């Protein structure tokens, strides 16, 4: 538990005008801290030095009140501090203070300096080239996107309200996807209305595309839609109930084969013939879709972040599509049968359909279990829990962003064709560290940061509304967003009245509670209640904002693929290395249990389940870490069954790494910058297949490295179940 000395009381009679135009109460403690920080760099802070510093602070405050009794600007305070230091002949202290202040001013300028940003990219700064583990920074189209991104980020920071830009640069908040927005009025992620587009046709480029007459054509069209949608937004795209969407086109294949059979096949064999041919068509079509998605590159310089939801279909075409999706994933990609990273597979469990032994689709659940033990996907949704948490059933947009239940003007439930307008994440651990163990101070700073986040989110909405249908025809004019607008119509009609969501993100509840209650707080009811109060307070606020602005503000448990690194790195610079908080070099995602500890899967789920229930239902996922499960799928089934009534969305993390030199299969060992075969030491991405859960999606960290903080977090994970992490030990490799 961190205990810090009592801090000075802010002066409520004097206001400070910040660089971004905000007015805040003058706080003497900030001057005191700045001088102590400078002193620690240039001298031993003895009791005598403490007394000198105290006297200096008194003089500075007296001078400020004398010259600026009503209000003072930041630069005026800094000038007085420098003058008093020089007057007192504290030259070393003055030099350090001035150097630090100048450096801060320089850092602020660099963030909006396009030339500096391009320089970082050309020098392959890790924070730039590895920010997104799905982007291969060695290839030309990604390099072009990264170049455009640093330009967009620099311009975007200048477009943001000053106090929002300042809070982002300091690390108080994170305005996500600055490389795309607000420079362009793009949307984030969505559930594509594939059903409407396939039924009614659409247009891409110069081609008018009619409704498909076969499942092969349908999946080909879907891959083209995905490529175009992913190039028109910056977040992930999902297909909800893809088995049910594609089944009518598989039935067209069946009817065609049945008609052909009338000419060539005996009457009693015609249906069998048509069904066998249709099964092959379904398999080939779904295999083509998997390969298409994994070979697509969008204008964003990456494979589209794509998720396929399935599992609720019951007729034979729907069931066959479900089985094909799973069998194709089990088989793997290419001659080496590598694990496909995309699309993310999301299988729905439902009581009475596939959950229990004896239910109609229980056999497909068994296939899903086999697939998860071998390829980690599918993740699973608990149908009834998703309805409870979000108001209706749907798959997440991208990896974890959930729409809330919504009905149109005719009272019809609508999910596909809806979208998210962006995310702003608050750095909760920083608030805890700044509060120095004072809970009242925590809530005071928390309130201030929530106000900034509100302004940032409202700006996201307003900027997105400035798009025109012509900016993204596939989204607004040709059906991906569910309605087909004219070129001059307002896109806001697809966003307002809570049709779209806008997300308030958060990170690091573990670290927050650690500041106040110590690092083993998980079984402390007071500590857990405190973390739940944070979620409840955020929930209260987003409901008020939704009522005020007319858009659905939701709480989002941020994936933090690179933010886990950025926030922790900035806070290490600000507060130093603090045990169990910044010394780990990463912050824990959202409400997740400390990854370094090993509760059972059941204990972990029981601990985490209350956070989405408390309000974090706009985006969430739970994981459990397992040993090799391929010989024990029943162990995984026990967790899935236990989770069904407790959590809505569950992922499987299990060792599936492979070395093609020595044939080792299991868990690779973390190295300083990646992973290596524990048998022969091989780390060549050409001859290994390393698959780790990066955040909501899987990643291949040897082929596409991730930022340092995420790598540290993955390396720190421990298993939640006993068992071997080796499937095949591998043989000796002679050089």
Where are the regions a protein language model picked out?
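Short, intrinsically disordered, low-complexity segments enriched in Ser/Thr and Pro
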Residues: 47-48, 539-547, 719-735
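Contiguous, well-ordered alpha-helical segments that form the cores/surfaces of helical PPI scaffolds
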Residues: 244, 502-515, 536, 693
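Long insertion/accessory domains within large nucleic-acid-processing enzymes
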Residues: 681-733
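Metallocofactor- and cofactor-centric catalytic cores in central/energy metabolism, strongly enriched
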Residues: 282-286, 290, 515, 707-715
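Short connector loops/turns at beta-strand edges and beta->alpha or beta->beta junctions
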Residues: 36, 429-433, 512-515
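Charged, amphipathic alpha-helical regulatory modules used
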Residues: 2-121, 711-712, 716-717
């Amino acid at each position: 538990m961190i205990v810090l000395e009592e801090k000075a009381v802010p002066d409520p009679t004097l206001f400070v005008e910040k660089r971004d135009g905000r007015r805040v109460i003058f706080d003497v403690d900030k001057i005191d801290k700045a001088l102590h920080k400078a002193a620690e760099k240039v001298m031993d802070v003895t009791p005598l030095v403490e007394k000198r510093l105290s006297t200096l602070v008194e003089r500075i405050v007296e001078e400020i009140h004398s010259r600026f009794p009503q209000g003072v600007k930041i630069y005026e305070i800094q000038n007085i501090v420098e003058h008093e230091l020089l007057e007192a002949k504290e030259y070393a202290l003055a030099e350090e203070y001035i150097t630090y202040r100048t450096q801060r001013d320089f850092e602020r300028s660099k963030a909006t300096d396009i030339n500096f940003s391009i320089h970082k990219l050309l020098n392959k700064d890790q924070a730039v080239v590895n920010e997104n583990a799905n982007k291969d920074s060695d290839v030309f189209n990604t390099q072009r996107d990264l170049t455009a991104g640093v330009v967009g980020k620099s311009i975007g920071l200048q477009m943001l309200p000053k106090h929002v830009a300042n809070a982002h640069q300091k690390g108080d908040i994170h305005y996500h996807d600055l490389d795309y927005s607000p420079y362009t009025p793009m949307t984030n992620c969505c559930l594509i209305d594939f059903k409407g587009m396939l039924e009614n046709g659409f247009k891409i480029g110069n081609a008018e595309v009619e409704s498909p007459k076969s499942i092969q054509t349908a999946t080909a069209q879907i891959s083209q839609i995905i490529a175009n949608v992913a190039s028109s937004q910056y977040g992930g795209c999902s297909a909800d109930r893809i088995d049910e969407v594609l089944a009518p086109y598989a039935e067209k294949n069946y009817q065609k084969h049945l008609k052909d059979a009338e000419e060539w096949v005996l009457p009693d064999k015609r249906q069998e013939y048509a069904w066998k041919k249709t099964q092959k068509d379904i398999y080939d079509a779904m295999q083509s879709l998997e390969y298409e998605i994994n070979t697509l590159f969008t204008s964003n310089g990456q494979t589209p972040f794509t998720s396929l939801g399935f599992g609720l279909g019951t007729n034979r075409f729907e069931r066959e599509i479900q089985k094909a999706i799973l069998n194709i994933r089990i088989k793997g990609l290419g001659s080496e049968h590598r694990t496909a990273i995309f699309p993310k597979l999301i299988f729905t469990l439902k009581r009475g359909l596939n959950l229990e032994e004896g239910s109609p689709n229980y056999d497909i659940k068994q296939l899903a279990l086999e697939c998860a033990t071998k390829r980690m996907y599918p993740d699973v949704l608990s149908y009834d829990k998703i309805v409870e948490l979000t108001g209706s059933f749907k798959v997440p947009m991208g990896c974890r962003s959930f729409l809330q239940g919504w009905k149109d003007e005719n009272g019809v439930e609508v999910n596909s064709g809806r979208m998210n307008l962006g995310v702003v994440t608050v750095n909760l651990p920083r608030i805890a560290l700044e509060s120095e163990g004072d809970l009242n101070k925590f809530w005071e700073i928390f309130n201030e940061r929530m106000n900034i986040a509100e302004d940032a989110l409202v700006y996201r909405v307003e900027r997105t509304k400035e798009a025109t249908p012509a900016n993204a025809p596939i989204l607004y004019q040709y059906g991906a967003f569910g309605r087909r607008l004219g070129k001059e119509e307002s896109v806001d009609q697809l966003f307002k009245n809570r049709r779209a969501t806008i997300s308030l993100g958060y990170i690091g509840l573990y670290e927050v509670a650690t500041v106040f209650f110590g690092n083993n707080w998980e079984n402390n009811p007071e500590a857990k209640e405190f973390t739940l109060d944070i979620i409840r307070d955020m929930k209260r606020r987003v409901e008020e904002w939704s009522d005020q602005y007319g858009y659905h503000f939701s709480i989002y448990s941020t994936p933090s693929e690179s933010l886990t690194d950025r926030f922790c790195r900035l806070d290490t610079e600000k507060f130093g290395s603090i045990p169990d908080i910044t010394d780990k070099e990463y912050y824990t995602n959202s409400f997740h249990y400390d990854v370094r500890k090993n509760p059972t899967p059941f204990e972990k789920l029981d601990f985490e389940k209350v956070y989405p229930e408390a309000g974090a239902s706009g985006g969430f996922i739970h994981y459990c870490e397992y040993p090799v499960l391929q010989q024990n799928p029943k162990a995984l089934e026990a967790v899935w069954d236990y989770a069904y009534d407790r959590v809505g969305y569950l992922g499987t993390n299990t060792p599936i790494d492979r070395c093609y030199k020595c044939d080792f299969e299991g868990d690779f060992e973390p190295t300083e910058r990646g992973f290596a075969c524990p048998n022969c030491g091989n780390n060549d991405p050409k001859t290994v297949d390393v698959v780790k859960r990066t955040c909501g999606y899987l990643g291949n960290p040897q082929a596409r490295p991730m930022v340092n903080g995420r790598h540290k977090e993955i390396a720190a994970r421990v298993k939640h179940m006993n068992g071997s992490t080796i499937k095949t030990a591998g043989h000796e490799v002679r050089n």
